[in-house]
Design a protein with these regions (language model features):
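Conserved alpha/beta cores of soluble small-molecule-handling proteins
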Residues: 1-172, 176-179, 203, 207, ...
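Glycine- and Gly-Pro-enriched alpha-helical subdomains that act as flexible
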Residues: 172, 179-202, 208
């Protein structure tokens, strides 16, 4: 239950948290966001998330509403007020409130800031990881700037719903050349028959996931070979392992793709080991 939200300079009860009807995030999806994992009251990889947030704001030419250290204070205060020890903190910044017009509003328009925090049942995540998840593949019909963490997520919503309706937990987008880009809310990985870990290069075809970034370091530390390249759905069908990564779910083994078993149909040893090692390499604040 959301006890308290931060909305434009004020901490307000969750049931009273409101935004203006002409907020550009509400009318145009003109905004960006970040979601950070929280463990033992600490924000995981806050520095990396704030760096990505700054990049997203700059790419959309949205003014920074406050310094990063002030945002950090707000996020930690939301954790305290909502009594969150293990969960997530959500931060959203939009271009602000202005008379509806597709073009940018006047330069003195103040960005809107919303921060919320909620607890999560990480024991349930562990159960899901132990069983592995199913994914489906769908044509990638998103805009090209998915490297920006925009609040405009309708294709992702439709993809996630399609997955749920087919008994899967995630959907992988596939581009026009037949290559997997990423999941609706995750980065996509496979492990080749030879044991090489493969994921698409972090370019404009995918979001540069923070968990993905940390995992690259984990792979190096563990002496595992990484190939940053595109792979097809067909290659994924024949992989030894597959998995997805995200801030709220860490590493989740994939055991079925399009109703075909991956490897022996059980969570792979590499994905399982990477999940266990993740927090040894992540930053806490």
């Amino acid at each position: 239950m959301l006890r308290t939200a931060y909305v434009n300079g004020r901490y307000v009860p969750g049931h009273l948290a409101m935004i203006h009807i002409e907020d550009r995030g509400y009318q145009f999806s003109d905004g960006v966001y970040e979601v950070c994992e929280v463990r033992d009251g600490c924000i995981i990889d806050e520095r990396r998330h704030m760096a990505r947030l700054a990049r997203s704001l700059d790419e959309l030419r949205i003014a920074r509403p406050m310094p990063a250290n002030s945002l950090s204070v707000v996020m930690h205060e939301c954790l305290r007020r909502n009594r969150v020890r293990d969960g997530i903190v959500y931060l959203q910044i939009t271009r602000g409130v202005a008379l509806r017009d597709h073009a940018f509003p006047p330069t003195d328009t103040r960005p809107s800031v919303v921060v919320t925090a909620r607890s999560m049942n990480f024991a349930e995540n562990e159960r899901i990881a132990a069983e592995g998840i199913a994914v489906i593949t769908l044509p990638d019909n998103r805009w090209e700037r998915v490297d920006i963490k925009s609040v405009s997520l309708l294709p992702n919503v439709l993809a996630k719903q399609a997955a749920r309706e087919q008994g899967a937990r995630e959907a992988w987008f596939v581009d026009r050349e037949g290559y997997v880009t990423e999941g609706s809310s995750t980065n996509a990985w496979i492990v080749s028959r030879e044991g090489r870990v493969i994921t698409r290069r972090a370019e404009r075809g995918i979001l540069r996931g923070i968990t993905r970034e940390v995992l690259v370091g984990v792979l190096a530390a563990e002496g595992l070979e990484l190939e940053e390249r595109s792979f097809t759905a067909e290659e994924a069908y024949g992989a030894r392992e597959a998995f997805v990564t995200s801030a709220s779910q860490l590493v989740l083994p994939v055991v079925r793709i399009d109703d075909r078993p991956v490897g022996n149909g059980a969570p792979g040893s590499i994905a399982t080991a990477l999940r266990a090692k993740f927090h040894e390499h992540a930053e806490r604040s």
